[in-house]
């Protein structure tokens, strides 16, 4: 079910096309920095998800924004596509970040659907086994697209550089956060509080860039 971000002072509604609770928390933190409230909109009901078959983050974010905007006439619909790019893996998992374990054939496991992050991290660790610490460079990348009535209007991108650890650290965040290490902070993404994470994360940077384009 999509979620809405809206600012009362401008009378603007943004529908964020995501059911990811982790992404919703990130958006909430980003929105709070701009005095924007985040709320769910159950009146939209359940909308069937489109097939994410784009080859890039921008392509997937655009197709989702355009698709969901047709269900909310007149409103701006915000879609995110993001993931992890690991240099030693030729930028994999990339657009397949959420399905890394599934692509490795782990969907037959009875726990795969309930522990997707755990399985994805396990596959990443397996693929990175034996890679020298200096060669474990990676980045989180996010592309946000806002569309109205089937037309994309704004596109913004954010990225943050880091390293992939050989074991998880921290209990916060989601996705690959326990393995994504920030050398300047000596912390993983999973060890950061939400406010700090928003200030430097790929999604926070993309969100700030999008709002700047929209002059919010």
Feature locations, PLM:
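Anionic-ligand binding patches
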Residues: 11-15, 21-216
